[in-house]
């Protein structure tokens, strides 16, 4: 039985482009600048006391091979690095400003709780009076199930009344909340992230008060089990501690998850405030909202004081203002001068405190930062981002629940650490994904210098019936986050899709209608915060949005070829994006299984094997995608340790390859976010690179290395080559800092498998701030390198600034000798001729002298059958568009792509071909397109397979989850009729020694 995988189904959404507004991005041209080859070691085995030996020693002394650290050493550095960061940022967490006078509060922690019954619907007084069966719970309280339900919270309390007003405040309740005080309905609210309150002074009494809270949940607009709801919720939340339903993929439950209290206030009090900094003019505009309960117009005195919050400075500001005030909300603006302000940024998050007082009685405080974040909408391509007028590139990851749980659990030390875990791996921003969160999270990001993108909780679509409610909640979102210098950007919707391709267009907004909604939301946001940078869409599946920065999501090393093939991304192509605009990539990544220690400690026993050697498949883990998706990336494994190893190995590789590929396109990609950083629960979102126990997976460290702000990077489309080939490797400088660098030297050293230097190359160069540029090519002539069959070589580069090495990179490849005893082949068809002419394993011959017949065209089948009957020569069938569905010798052969995505990797049957590595048939070079291209796009469908040399796994369709072992589908096979293959050979033979050698070994084995 197959289960539904919603997120895999969404990933299969095809991006339909309004082409007239879109443009494809070609790779950045690499200049024809060659590194100078300065040293060549001719015979590495004969270097005793001659000059070559001295050269080797000199190279080794200055440029020792940059060995990869062990995971254990990286883990040790991680813990030490976090402690250093805690010490570094401790001063910014220490308050130096005076406190405002706090209002008196009565906080409610303990409630009786139960789900609504039929009796409650018939007689609501039963709830108000506390009849029925209740359980005791403690706030915060978030729970399941998902879907439609109603619950009640009830508590009784005494209260001391005086001449002040009494406001009941809810900091966070999900989703539709109704509040009753002493049987009076006093307050309603729809949503989950925004605080709401009401004056209940008239309904309170000294003794025996009863507070009842009705919380109603709904199905989200994404739907559940074929039903659609109206809940404005995306796919990110708090979850709950239940391994079956609560851990995984942020299920949309509900409940009162934040503080509830009654607060005493003056009849005239400060309701809200926001500071809009203007660093260009060294001023700050303070917006103050004052509420007045009195029914008459009167005078109010507003006192404002500003001083440094977390640093020592002589700056102090005090001001007294007389204003008229009416009943209700009154909005005032005050401009103050802050000369030579300390600017807020990622490294020095300086904050100020403003205290606002009304009539010398009520006080309100708020921290703010003097910073400017803006987007260039004047110069093409639009979309360059700036922090404090310096260009900036946003490098980060997605957050889905773990920070929110820190606040719920009152664990602020963990909250600090989670933000610093991001900083340690060179992130400068969090995408707090698909929902606004508790204010404490933004406050700590303010103090720790972590920039944040805040998302409105929409995913895929917006129901027409919720058009205006969603607009209202967008305003709430901006009011919720606008005070925080860390929040630099907002977005409205995640992965919108073309509603005309669904059966819900009568329910949901079309793309054009959604654009209208965006325009309204833009105006709402600008009303609340004129300086807000807006990115309307995250991961646009119905592009483009007509204003602002575009965004795409890319999972092409997990959901195969999602957005664009990995070979294209690696080469430098981008998906088609909005004309004249830069873009962002707000999600990319792969799943990596949790560490074994975490599994043993937290997983249910039924998910795990009895011992580490027992046969085990990860389909036991609820909602895990590894068993469904791994087949295009690595072998199916037998035991839990190997599954974890290969899963994490692939995740680490993908994190590095994709991050660096996106960084190389900083000319257009100004923002990137890995999906995800830290898990909120065991196996919650296994695309995370740090487990819920805060122990990193290997991918965390490759991600960290790929995000080094000033980095040297090697790029080459070939992983293998022959002796006598000339290999050009691109060298890039990726500079995410705003600093220009001159006086730079890059030294490249070619090493053999023993890390002895073979050749040395040099280039003098420079680097511009916030630019990624290819500075040149390292041309490796392999003709003078001795090889015995296969030689592992490494090209290492050392980037120096003013004589000091500041970064290194390594590119590994294999060099092969052409040691084939060439097989005579008679070719039938153009592709067959091309294979014979370009593959060093074959040579052309006539049909009488040939060892084998190679056929690639259906029109030659009769000739092949005649040869088979007359001289019984073996035949190699290359299935392609000219030879796809055919009969031969009473057997039918079809070329099928059913449940096989175009694969960059195909497993080799190592029991039949034991001399090959598991990943030898991956990331093959295509000389026709000059990039990495598919290994195979089809498998062979036939009724008889004797030997299967290369295969692919049958994969579930997107939206399904595979259970049990997967069927193997032949890609290179043999039976009595001959050898059959769907390997892509055009452009691959002659330039990929492994695929040449596999063909040779299979054919030679039958001769």
What is the meaning of each model-derived region?
Residues 2-87, 94-97, 113-116, 148-269, ...:
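Accessory beta-strand-rich segments of carbohydrate-active enzymes
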Residues 2-119, 252-255, 490, 523-526, ...:
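Substrate-binding clefts and catalytic carboxylate motifs of secreted carbohydrate-active enzymes
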Residues 141-156, 164-169, 174-182, 187-190, ...:
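Active-site-adjacent substrate/metal-binding segments within catalytic domains
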Residues 181, 283-323, 726-766, 773-779, ...:
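Beta-strand-rich binding/interaction modules
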Residues 205-208, 291-378, 787-819:
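Extended acidic/polar, glycine-enriched regions
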Residues 271-275, 285, 475-612, 668:
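Active-site region of glycoside hydrolase catalytic domains
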Residues 528, 901-997:
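Catalytic beta-strand/loop cores that center a nucleophilic Ser/Cys/Thr
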Residues 849-893, 975-977, 1005:
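Short alpha-beta junction capping motif
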């Amino acid at each position: 039985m197959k289960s539904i995988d919603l997120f895999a189904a969404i990933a299969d959404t095809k991006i339909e482009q309004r082409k007239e507004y879109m443009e494809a991005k070609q790779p950045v041209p690499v200049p024809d600048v060659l590194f100078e080859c300065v040293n060549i070691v001719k015979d590495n085995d004969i270097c005793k006391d001659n000059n070559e030996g001295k050269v080797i020693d000199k190279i080794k002394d200055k440029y020792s091979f940059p060995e990869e650290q062990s995971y254990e050493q990286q883990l040790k550095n991680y813990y030490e690095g976090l402690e250093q960061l805690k010490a570094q940022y401790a001063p910014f967490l220490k308050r130096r400003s005076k406190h405002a006078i706090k209002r008196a509060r009565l906080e409610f922690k303990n409630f009786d709780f139960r789900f609504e019954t039929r009796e409650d619907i018939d007689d609501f007084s039963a709830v108000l009076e506390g009849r029925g069966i209740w359980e005791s719970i403690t706030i915060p309280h978030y729970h399941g199930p998902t879907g439609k339900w109603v619950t009640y919270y009830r508590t009784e309390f005494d209260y001391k009344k005086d001449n002040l007003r009494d406001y009941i405040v809810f900091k966070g309740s999900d989703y539709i909340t109704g509040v009753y005080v002493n049987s009076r309905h006093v307050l309603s609210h729809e949503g989950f992230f925004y605080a709401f309150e009401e004056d209940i002074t008239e309904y309170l009494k000294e003794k025996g008060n009863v507070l009842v809270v009705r919380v109603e949940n709904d199905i989200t607009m994404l739907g559940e089990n074929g039903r659609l709801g109206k809940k404005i919720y995306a796919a990110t939340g708090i979850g709950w501690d239940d391994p079956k339903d609560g851990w995984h993929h942020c299920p949309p439950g509900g409940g009162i998850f934040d503080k509830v209290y009654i607060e005493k206030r003056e009849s005239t009090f400060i309701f809200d405030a926001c500071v809009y900094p203007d660093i260009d003019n060294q001023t700050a505009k303070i917006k103050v909202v004052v509420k007045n309960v009195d029914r008459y117009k009167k005078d109010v005195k507003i006192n404002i004081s500003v001083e440094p919050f977390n640093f020592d400075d002589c700056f102090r500001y005090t001001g007294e203002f007389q204003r008229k005030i009416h009943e209700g909300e009154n909005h005032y603006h005050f401009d103050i001068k802050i000369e030579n302000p300390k600017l807020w940024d990622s490294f020095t998050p300086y904050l100020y405190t403003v205290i606002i007082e009304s009539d010398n009685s009520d006080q309100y405080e708020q921290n703010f930062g003097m910073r400017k974040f803006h987007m260039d909408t004047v110069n093409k391509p639009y979309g360059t981002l700036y922090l404090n007028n310096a260009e900036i590139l946003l490098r980060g990851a997605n957050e889905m629940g773990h920070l929110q749980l820190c606040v719920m659990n009152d664990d602020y030390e963990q909250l600090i650490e989670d933000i610093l875990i991001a900083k340690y791996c060179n992130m400068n921003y969090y995408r707090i994904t698909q929902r606004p969160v508790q204010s404490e999270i933004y406050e700590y990001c303010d103090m720790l210098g972590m920039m944040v993108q805040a998302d409105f909780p929409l995913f895929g679509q917006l129901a027409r019936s919720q058009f205006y409610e969603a607009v209202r909640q967008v305003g709430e979102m901006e009011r919720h986050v606008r005070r925080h210098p860390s929040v630099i950007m907002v977005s409205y919707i995640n992965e919108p899709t073309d509603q005309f391709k669904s059966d819900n267009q009568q329910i949901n907004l079309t793309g054009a209608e959604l654009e209208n909604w965006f325009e309204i939301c833009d105006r709402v946001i600008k009303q609340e915060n004129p300086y807000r940078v807006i990115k309307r869409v995250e991961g646009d599946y119905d592009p483009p949005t007509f204003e602002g920065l575009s965004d795409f999501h890319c999972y092409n090393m997990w959901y195969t070829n999602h957005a664009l093939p990995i070979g294209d991304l690696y080469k430098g192509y981008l998906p088609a994006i909005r004309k004249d605009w830069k873009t962002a990539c707000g999600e990319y990544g792969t799943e990596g299984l949790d560490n074994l220690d975490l599994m043993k400690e937290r997983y249910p026993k039924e998910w795990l094997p009895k011992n580490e050697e027992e046969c085990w498949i990860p389909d036991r883990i609820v909602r895990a995608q590894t068993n469904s998706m791994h087949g295009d990336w690595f072998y199916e494994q037998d035991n839990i340790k190997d599954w974890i190893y290969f899963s994490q190995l692939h995740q680490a590789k993908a994190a590095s390859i994709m991050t660096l590929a996106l960084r190389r396109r900083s000319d257009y990609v100004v923002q990137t976010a890995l999906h995800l950083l830290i898990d909120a629960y065991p196996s919650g979102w296994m695309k995370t690179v740090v487990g819920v126990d805060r122990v990193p997976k290997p991918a965390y460290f490759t991600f960290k290395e790929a995000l080094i702000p000033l980095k040297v990077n090697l790029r080459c489309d070939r992983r293998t080559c022959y002796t006598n080939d000339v290999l050009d490797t691109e060298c890039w400088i990726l500079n995410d800092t705003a600093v220009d660098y001159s006086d730079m030297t890059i030294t490249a050293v070619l090493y053999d498998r023993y890390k002895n230097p073979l050749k040395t190359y040099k280039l003098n160069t420079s680097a511009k701030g916030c630019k990624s540029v290819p500075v040149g090519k390292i041309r490796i002539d392999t003709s003078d390198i001795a090889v015995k069959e296969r030689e592992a070589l490494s090209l290492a580069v050392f980037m120096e600034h003013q004589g000091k090495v500041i970064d290194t990179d390594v590119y590994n490849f294999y060099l092969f000798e052409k040691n084939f005893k060439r097989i005579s082949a008679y070719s039938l068809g153009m592709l067959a001729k091309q294979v014979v002419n370009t593959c060093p394993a074959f040579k052309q011959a006539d049909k009488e002298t040939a060892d084998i017949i190679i056929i690639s065209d259906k029109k030659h089948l009769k000739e092949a059958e005649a040869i088979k009957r007359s001289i019984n020569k073996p035949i190699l069938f290359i299935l392609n568009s000219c030879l796809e569905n055919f009969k031969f010798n009473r057997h039918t052969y079809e070329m099928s792509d059913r449940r096989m995505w175009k694969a960059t990797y195909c497993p080799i049957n190592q029991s039949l071909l034991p001399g090959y590595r598991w990943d030898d048939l991956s990331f093959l070079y295509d000389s026709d397109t000059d990039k990495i291209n598919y290994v195979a796009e089809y498998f062979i469908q036939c009724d008889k397979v004797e030997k299967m040399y290369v295969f692919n796994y049958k994969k579930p369709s997107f939206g399904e989850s595979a259970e049990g072992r997967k069927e193997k589908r032949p890609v290179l096979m043999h039976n009595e009729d001959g050898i059959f293959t769907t390997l892509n050979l055009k452009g691959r033979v002659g330039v990929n020694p492994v695929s040449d050698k596999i063909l040779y070994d299979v054919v030679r084995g039958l001769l």
